[in-house]
Amino acid sequence: MRIDRIELRLVRLPLVHFFETSFGRIHDKPFLLVRLLAGGLEAWGECVAEETPYYSSETTETAWYVITGFLGPRLLGLDIAHPREVFPAFRAVRGHNMAKAALEMAAWDLHARAEGCSLGRLLGGVRTRIASGVSVGIQDSLDDLAAKIRTELDAGYRRVKIKIKPGWDVEAVRMVRERFGPIPLMVDANAAYTLADAGHLAALDAFDLMMIEQPLDYDDVSDHARLQRQLKTAICLDESIHSPRVARDAIAAGACRVINIKPGRVGGFSPSIAVHDACAEHGVPVWHGGMLESGIGRTHNIHLSTLPNFTLPGDVAASRRYFVPDLIDPPVDVAPDGTIAVPTGPGIGVAVDLERVERATLRLASLGR
């Protein structure tokens, strides 16, 4: 199949509630949307690059430049028999995994629609529902954090993750344990600490956490291995895992006991499946992370989460936590038992509301005919 046209949009949506990590606080979310048109079909992808280069060196602007100038023209020149061919075709472009993933994942959606099957089935998924966890950002006070967690637990979420940073860590976790007891709980540092903080981080061992996510710098697998030897709590790597090779190296080094998979971070579905399979081979569980995606990207995440080694609840939550209205119909919803139904229609299995997309669009580029 050849792609007739690629549409790229910069869109911005207001968040229902501000979201704060160790990188800072945001009140809205700019991101890129990809729409592929081919043979009377359309398909969608979402680029998870942020406006700022804090989580990743990629930004919405770098992704726009790379997609319009390099990746998009290359994709238009391909005759694609299967979407697994797309990521290798981008090899000449170094890095820029988030830009690559937006196009690659849209190609998977397109192929699933052409085959008349769900994206999850095409990816090799085995589930009809996935377990949903929730990520709670840094709040203005411990009471605000407690109120936020109470709301999420009442909504049925099966696991709570709280963001931490120096000055907002041990006492925040202590409060959660004192008020909510033995709920499934983990923390995410977003690389806010150094190995010199090992003794401080070891204080978290007392709280029976599922894991501590990405405590150290994004490019420091060796120090994560040293830290893991000093902690009882499992380390989960996020920002560090930007390829299947790095995942294998991290496992071999003992740098983590859990891995968070985000397709945007590794370049799309094909490398995500490779990371998933490497982890399964070594008995390392995985879960699906989130990047405050719209319903388009969120639905992609749901489908990938159906693969068998996604054994832990991921950061794939209801649309209403983030965007009202969302860009899809029906929006992503969480059942009272904390699970999300996997869409069964062709491709991502939900309808994209083009009118809402157009209202949110700040910039549009079109490649091809």
Spell out what each predicted region is.
Residues R121-L231:
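Metal-dependent enolase-superfamily TIM-barrel catalytic cores that perform enediolate-based chemistry
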Residues M1-L15, I26, F31, L292-R369:
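Flexible C-terminal active-site loop/helix
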Residues G45, S132-V136, V160-I162, L185-A189, ...:
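Hydrophobic faces of well-ordered beta-strands that scaffold small-molecule active sites
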Residues R94, M105-V136:
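Glycine-rich, aromatic-flanked loop segments that form ligand/cofactor-binding clefts
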Residues S22-H27, D154:
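Short Gly/Pro-enriched turn/cap motifs at secondary-structure boundaries
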Residues I3, V34, G40, L71, ...:
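Conserved, mostly hydrophobic/aromatic
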Residues L36-L37, L41-A114:
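Metal- or metallocofactor-binding catalytic centers and their adjacent structured scaffolds
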Residues L71, D208, D219-C236, I241-T339:
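Shared catalytic-loop signature of beta/alpha-barrel
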